[in-house]
Amino acid sequence: FSDKFLMKNYISNGGLLGGHPDRNIKLGIDYCSGSLGNGLSVGCGVSLSYLKNKINKKVLVILGDGECNEGMIWESALFAGHHKLSNLFVFVDYNRQQGFGTTDEILGLDSLKQKFQSFKWNVYEVNGHNFKELINIKKKLKKNNKKPSVIIANTIKGKGVPFYENTFESHYKILSKSEFEKIKHL
């Protein structure tokens, strides 16, 4: 993912990395979930298939907190807990912002942790900017007790970039050359 061509053409016509990923097996993107909420449903299906066919693989689904406003997320979460999809791992970027407002303004999630716990998930909350916490969570995930697991990573959108930190402008925007030059040293 560090290839300069990929990043140079991010969210552009002909680029391989869009705002919502397109399926690209070479890049490790097995499914495109441009319609928010679909990714967890697909992840549940793949997870169930692996378990039924005794295939020892894990399924990772990455969600944004705004995506957790979608009803399909909660139907899938309930399904995963009920069917004990222990090979399913979800990572939620919980930055409390969406493309057009804060999560609380648009549709508050209240306690994301309690919601997943009530659906019979293992729930881990971490500081999404602390790499030690993120690495240590991997050890806990190995001790999975026959439930799906969710990591809720509390983050700040655009953290460390003064003109983007905690702003809506950073949601769909590509850095200009001058903006990139300003942050290279950070």
Stretches found by the model and what they are:
Residues 70-95, 150-152:
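A short alpha/beta connector and helix-capping loop motif
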Residues 95-97, 129, 156:
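Active-site beta-loop-alpha junctions enriched in small/polar residues
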Residues 2-9, 80-93, 117-121:
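A glycine-rich helix N-cap at a beta->alpha junction
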Residues 54-57, 104-137:
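Conserved thiamine diphosphate
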Residues 1-82:
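Cofactor-binding active-site loop characterized by glycine-rich and histidine/acidic residues
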Residues 131-186:
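Glycine/aspartate-rich loop-and-adjacent alpha/beta segment that forms the canonical ThDP
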Residues 57-61, 88, 147-155:
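Generic beta-sheet signal
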Residues 22, 72-74, 100-104, 161-166:
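Short acidic, glycine/serine/threonine-rich loops at helix termini
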